[in-house]
Amino acid sequence: MRENRPVIALDFPTLEDVKAFLAKFPADEKLYVKIGMELYYAAGPEIIRYVKELGHSIFLDLKLHDIPNTVKSAMRVLSNLGVDMTNVHAAGGVEMMKAAREGLGDGPILIAVTQLTSTSEEQMRDFQNIQTTLQESVVHYAQKTAEAGLDGVVCSAHEVPKIKEATNQDFICLTPGIRPAGAAVGDQKRVMTPADAHQIGSDYIVVGRPITQAEDPVAAYHDIKAQWNDQ
C-alpha cells in the first residue's frame, strides 16, 4: 500500500507557522503531513482540525510508550481526532501494542517505531545495552509489531528489505531520514534519497527540512515527489 505523496514533516512551533507554510500550496493540492510532538503539544487538537479542514491527510507522530492501559486510553482519544496514521514505540512491548490497536480501532493506520534514525549501532549497544546489530534489532521489533497486529513500522530505508522478508510484503515500512542527493543530513544517521527509498521498497517516506526550509517549498516538494515516484 505504497503512498505516492511524500509525507511532509511539519516541524514548526506554532499553528500560525503551519498556516503560513500550507498557504503556499494550491488549495486543490492535498498533502500528507506529519504532526509531531512539538507542534501537537503547542497547538493541541486544534492543529488536527485545521489541517483536516483543508483536506490533507495526517500522520500524528507522538510515539506513545507507557503501560498498556494508559496507551489504550490515549489511543481511544486520538481515534476521535480523525487522523489517518499514528504510532507507538515497539519497545513498549507486544501487550502495549495490542492495547494501542484496541484503543485506536480499525480505521487509522497504526505503526510502531523500531530504532530512531538518529540512533547509531554504537549508541544502541552502549546506551540500550542491545548486543546485536542495529538491523537485527530493527527486524526483531518489526516481527513483534506484526505479532501484535499493527500495520507496520517506522524504520530506516536501509532496513526495509529485511523487514519485508521477516514479515510480509504488505507490512508498511515508513521511512524518515530521507534527503535529496546533496542535501545536509542534519541529525540523521541513516539516510537515503527518495529514489533509492522507492527502489528499496519503502511504502511511505517522511521529508522535513528539505521541503519546509527550502527557498521554494512547493517546488522542492514536487521535485522530491517526482524522485519518490521514480519520474
Swiss-Prot record:
Which EC class does it fall in?
lyase
What Enzyme Commission number does this protein have?
4.1.1.23
Per the record, the pathway is: Pyrimidine metabolism; UMP biosynthesis via de novo pathway; UMP from orotate: step 2/2
Catalytic reactions of this protein? orotidine 5'-phosphate + H(+) = UMP + CO2
The protein's role, per its UniProt record: Catalyzes the decarboxylation of orotidine 5'-monophosphate (OMP) to uridine 5'-monophosphate (UMP).
Question: InterPro entries under this entry?
Answer: Aldolase_TIM, OMPdecase, OMPdecase_AS, OMPdecase_bac, OMPdeCOase_dom, RibuloseP-bd_barrel
Q: Which GO terms describe its cellular component?
A: cytosol
Keywords noted in UniProt? Decarboxylase, Lyase, Pyrimidine biosynthesis
Residues at which substrate binds: 11, 34, 61-70, 117, 179, 188, 208-209
| Molecular function per GO | orotidine-5'-phosphate decarboxylase activity
Q: Which gene encodes it?
A: pyrF
Source species of the chain: Streptococcus thermophilus (strain ATCC BAA-491 / LMD-9)
Q: What is this protein called?
A: Orotidine 5'-phosphate decarboxylase
The record's annotation in Gene3D superfamilies points to: Aldolase class I (3.20.20.70)
Q: Which GO terms describe its biological process?
A: 'de novo' pyrimidine nucleobase biosynthetic process; 'de novo' UMP biosynthetic process
